[in-house]
Amino acid sequence: MAKITRALISVSDKTGIVEFSRELAGYGVEILSTGGTAKLLREAGLKVKDVSEFTGFPEMLDGRVKTLHPKVHGGLLGMRGNPEHVATMKAHGIEPIDMVVVNLYPFEATVAKPDCTLEDAIENIDIGGPTMLRSAAKNNADVTVVVDHNDYRLVLDEMKAAGGGVSKETNFRLAVKVYQHTAAYDGAISNWLGARTGEGVAAYPDTLTLQFKKAQGMRYGENPHQSAAFYVERDVKEASVATARQLQGKELSYNNIGDTDAALECVKQFAEGPGCVIVKHANPCGVAIGDTLLDAYDRAYKTDPESAFGGIIAFNGELDEATAKAIVERQFVEVIIAPKVSAKASEVVAAKKNVRLLECGTWQKEPMPRLDFKRVNGGLLVQYTDLALHGELKVVTKRAPTEKEMIDLLFTWRVAKFVKSNAIVYGKDGMTIGVGAGQMSRVNSARIAAIKAEHAGLPVAGSVMASDAFFPFRDGLDNAAAVGITAVIQPGGSMRDEEVIAAADEHGMAMVFTSMRHFRH
């Protein structure tokens, strides 16, 4: 490999750049630079040649044109092993540039500011930086290109081991990273500007560019005959299954990740006390809050012990020794996830070496808006995640719910939001009594919820019921009354609302409309 003799350095993020440049200088590397980077390096006592001196052409247009010059791009793109390239470079006085260290104007950080104007955004679109990066990356056989300060040490270590050069294999990997970076950069620009082609700002741009990074290969997907991988967003800003740290256990499977996400996002809804959610096939089969985490787990498990077998368990507080012990002694579990796991709890779970134990960190009270995607053949459905809980709450029956009933209604309503439609949830005293999920008719979901409660030995009488969407007929209310439901919460909005309200009044039930539906498919 050839020794690096000249590097062009121009960075917006100056993390570690002085130290990196100092070590390059120690190998005799000539440093070319521009603007603020050159100033910083000189102040650190390093010898720097301005790019304008190197090219013989001044910076102009308020700094918009600095490096867009044949002496720069010829020095990057010229193939050292091509005699014609070498002769052309020599004829035009073009000297080779062996390394480019560039990161780009902070476009995403700029447009994230609430007071960002179109002019601000435009001025933070980097032109020279991506051009140099792409030129260097294209000629990676001869040029080392560094776009991430986390790679400085990798490059220096290799130069030290190789006497001042970097291997072609490393150059190739760094070049791939450049194209990933510039693709994301251009995608962010396209998305932001594409939402502003008409009047005002559109919720969705004309074209949508997404980038996810491969986090994990998988043995198979949803089924053994399907291949799969797990990709994560570049910058996840909240606690999630994508950011969770695995403390022990087998590698997470495709289904594990989907179910763990469902469990974690559901348990985040409950901030009033220790909470537990048990999920099977992306549906909550038991949800509870309690005086302690152990109490919450006990109550969630009692909803449906049969379905909890092989399930995913999520908590909203630190997993403690007592709760961990109860889980491993009571049931087979695929995944346990919590914001934090105590050392004692980790020791307990370690007895079951295949159990996947995840620590996700704490989350903020108000969730961050984000996009949801659903792939269809030939397209992509895009919507904002369902983060709202309810609209205006309206008591529509003669009898208003008691204070206790209202607490239980809001509890079951939060659970119903995470149950596959058609969803019916029976609950009482901060725990689910029965869950009816995924049925084509709403009344059948209600029947299943009652069957589940009976099978678990839990009395339905005195419980409340939540429905993710309106009741199209009164039969759902009649069925609920027959098993002892005393209050109902649902969106309302059916053509037969009056008939449904009349049924509730006949049975002496209280009913609340939420003015918001929560279909989940």
UniProtKB/Swiss-Prot annotation:
- Part of which pathway? Purine metabolism; IMP biosynthesis via de novo pathway; 5-formamido-1-(5-phospho-D-ribosyl)imidazole-4-carboxamide from 5-amino-1-(5-phospho-D-ribosyl)imidazole-4-carboxamide (10-formyl THF route): step 1/1; Purine metabolism; IMP biosynthesis via de novo pathway; IMP from 5-formamido-1-(5-phospho-D-ribosyl)imidazole-4-carboxamide: step 1/1
Q: What is its EC number?
A: 2.1.2.3, 3.5.4.10
Matches recorded under PROSITE patterns: MGS (PS51855)
Molecular function in Gene Ontology: IMP cyclohydrolase activity; phosphoribosylaminoimidazolecarboxamide formyltransferase activity
Instruction: Alphabetically list the UniProt keywords.
Output: Hydrolase, Multifunctional enzyme, Purine biosynthesis, Transferase
Q: Which InterPro entries match?
A: AICAR_Tfase_dup_dom_sf, Cytidine_deaminase-like, MGS-like_dom, MGS-like_dom_sf, PurH-like
Disulfide bond entries = none
Question: Could you state one GO cellular component term attached to this entry?
Answer: cytosol
Comment block on domains? The IMP cyclohydrolase activity resides in the N-terminal region.
Name the record gives this protein: Bifunctional purine biosynthesis protein PurH
What species is given as this protein's source?
Geotalea uraniireducens (strain Rf4) (Geobacter uraniireducens)
